[in-house]
């Protein structure tokens, strides 16, 4: 681990330099993340059709809700990790890392089970019709199957950033976006999987990025790494994560509600095609 990549530089390097080192990768990663849905829409529109784009748009509120739970754990955990590292409590920081894994699995599985059973009623509430429900259902089911991966990917990326590896977090995001863009045309046009192909492209791209994150945290030479004794959920850590992550969770929840209202309004006044416009 080089000095530049060490989390210890957070307490020694000039603040201006640290702001640049952390802000620029974060901006690039956030910009790249916005290309996810854009890429899916472009390939689905050309390969499946206009109604499929409307079906995709109907899944956005549910995907925003999944991201809200991801930020609940990710933001809270990244803040706690930074605090523990600042206190030189490296064992405590590792315990936070272990709790991130378990919390993401628990929340991801619960979210998946709940919405797999309620998927059709939820999509109809979001504004689906008989013309668009099949597209939205096909896409969202696959996304839900990979929901635990999404939660883990978002959570570990936040911890990567707060533990002194902002560039690695950026590369994980960029890799996911690039792989998604490469697999979309292959699965939609090459294999003829339709909207399901786009969903599989999203899940597989996140699996690959998550694999890189897991490899990083599996190395004993890293200050933060997987090891025995860190995976038991501890009430003080869980409370800290949830209390800190509550604000970004509520912000994402509001974003989810806004998209629902917009979609329902578009359906009422413009029909199915307006939702995908």
Predicted regions and their residues:
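Alpha-helical transmembrane segments of multi-pass membrane transporters/permeases
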Residues: 104, 159-182, 196, 200-203
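Short alpha-helical transmembrane segments in multi-pass integral membrane proteins
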Residues: 1-23, 81-148, 190-245
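Small-residue-rich hydrophobic transmembrane alpha-helices
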Residues: 53-113, 150-169, 263, 275-277
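Transmembrane helical elements of multi-pass membrane transporters/channels
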Residues: 21-40, 142, 176, 205-209, ...
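Hydrophobic transmembrane alpha-helices of multi-pass small-molecule transporters
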Residues: 65-68, 180-184, 210-214
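Helix-loop interface residues and adjacent transmembrane-helix termini in multi-pass membrane transporters
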Residues: 35-38, 47-50, 84-87, 162-163, ...
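Interfacial/gating helices of multi-pass transporter permease domains
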Residues: 44-64, 131-135, 195-196, 237-244, ...
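N-terminal transmembrane alpha-helices
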Residues: 10-47, 61-76, 80, 105-112, ...
């Amino acid at each position: 681990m080089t000095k530049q990549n060490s989390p210890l530089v957070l307490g020694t390097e000039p603040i201006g330099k640290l702001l640049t080192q952390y802000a620029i990768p974060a901006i690039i990663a956030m910009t790249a993340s916005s290309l996810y849905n854009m890429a899916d829409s472009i390939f689905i529109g050309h390969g499946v059709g206009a109604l499929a784009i409307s079906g995709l748009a109907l899944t956005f509120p549910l995907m925003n809700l999944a991201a809200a739970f991801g930020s609940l754990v990710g933001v809270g955990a990244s803040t706690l990790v930074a605090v523990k590292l600042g206190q030189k409590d490296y064992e405590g920081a590792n315990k936070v890392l272990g709790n991130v894994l378990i919390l993401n699995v628990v929340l991801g599985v619960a979210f998946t089970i709940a919405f797999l059973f309620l998927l059709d009623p939820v999509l109809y509430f979001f504004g689906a019709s008989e013309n668009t429900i099949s597209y939205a259902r096909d896409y969202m089911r696959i996304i839900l199957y990979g929901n635990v991966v999404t939660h883990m990917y978002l959570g570990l990326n936040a911890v990567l950033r707060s533990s002194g590896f902002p560039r690695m977090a950026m590369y994980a995001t960029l890799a996911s976006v690039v792989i998604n863009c490469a697999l979309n045309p292959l699965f939609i046009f090459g294999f003829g999987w339709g909207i399901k192909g786009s969903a599989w492209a999203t899940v597989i791209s996140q699996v690959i990025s998550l694999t890189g994150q897991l490899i990083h945290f599996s190395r004993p030479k890293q200050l933060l790494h997987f090891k025995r004794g860190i995976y038991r959920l501890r009430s003080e850590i869980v409370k800290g994560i949830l209390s800190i992550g509550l604000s970004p969770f509520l912000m994402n929840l509001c974003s989810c509600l806004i998209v629902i209202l917009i979609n329902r309004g578009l359906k009422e006044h413009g029909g199915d095609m307006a939702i995908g416009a």
